[in-house]
A protein has these predicted regions:
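His/Asp/Glu-enriched short active-site or ligand-binding loop at hydrolase and phosphoryl-transfer sites
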Residues: 50, 177-203, 223, 249
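Basic- and aromatic-lined ligand-binding clefts that recognize polyanionic substrates
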Residues: 24-37, 131-190
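Structured C-terminal subdomain patch of bacterial secreted/periplasmic proteins
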Residues: 24-25, 116-117, 121-124, 133, ...
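Short helices/loops that flank or line small-molecule/ion binding pockets
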Residues: 73-80, 99-100, 206-215
Length: 262
């Protein structure tokens, strides 16, 4: 208890600046949050990000506060933020920061609706309503274009791969988006079914038999950047399974993970 009290006393002078909730010094707790901040011209106010925040390039040069699951409250506090922007999944970290007097803002990036609302929240909080409104309008135009695109009946079935631990195998340690993820919202707009009706999961090994059982009509690979070499590599990996409807009909789509907001 005495040690905790001593730590609080040391931190108190640093926390005076956190009470007004301004946006002069912002720390981002997720790559998607960092992108939104830069999209509404708040990039110059960002003073800390996670080690996974790679876009835009300027964010890579900022101090790091940890990763998605190993964030350091001490590192965040040391940056003297006037606002910390977190995802809903960061509730425990957010509570710790609030208890120390650090202002936070939670946003939801699991759905297209949540992303639009995050622009609006940041716009209102940080006085960039015009920039935020422009981004929301652009997203709504994109939604409308998807919603009114020609639908296929019966609907296509899509396998959405959002990451992979083994770049040399199409079926080893892949991360598959489920019904709880952002991409399910996109598929719904398109009138496409997700072959994974469960939560987003890691598949340590997806056997050829298991893959064939899923019968995806479309395979959507989400990658870190738009690179023709990566696109070619992914398509060559999946070409090993010509029995799949998606491969047979050349429906392997490789997209930059920012395709929705650009």
């Amino acid at each position: 208890m005495i040690r905790l009290f001593a730590v609080i006393i040391v931190l108190l002078p640093r926390l005076v600046w956190a009470s007004d909730g301004s946006c002069e010094r912002i720390v981002s707790l997720a790559p998607s949050v960092t992108e939104v901040l830069y999209d509404v011209d708040l990039g110059e106010r960002v003073v800390g990000v996670t080690r996974y925040c790679r876009y835009p390039e300027a964010a890579q040069k900022l101090p790091k506060i940890g990763g998605f699951y190993d964030m350091s409250v001490e590192s965040i506090v040391a940056l003297k933020p006037t606002l910390v922007v977190a995802l809903a999944e960061h509730e425990s970290v957010r509570r710790s920061l609030e208890n120390l007097g650090v202002s936070t803002l939670a946003v939801d990036h699991t759905t297209p609706k949540g992303i639009k609302e995050s622009f609006q929240k940041l716009g209102a909080r940080c006085g960039v309503e015009t920039e935020a409104a422009a981004r929301v309008e652009a997203l709504e135009r994109r939604e409308a274009a998807l919603r009114f695109a020609d639908r296929v009946v019966p609907p296509l079935r899509a396998l959405v791969v959002v990451g992979r631990a083994n770049e040399g195998s199409p079926t080893s340690s892949i991360y598959v988006s489920g019904n709880d993820g952002f991409y399910s919202g996109i598929l719904e707009l398109l009138g496409v079914l997700n072959v994974n009706n469960d939560a987003t999961m890691t598949l340590p090994t997806l056997s050829p038999e298991g893959l064939l059982a899923l019968k995806p009509d479309v395979i959507l690979e989400v990658v870190g950047k738009d690179d023709p070499a990566v696109t070619t590599d992914r398509k060559q990996l999946w070409a090993r399974y010509p029995q799949l409807p998606a491969v047979r009909n050349n429906r392997i789509l490789v997209v930059d993970y920012r395709f929705w907001v650009e």
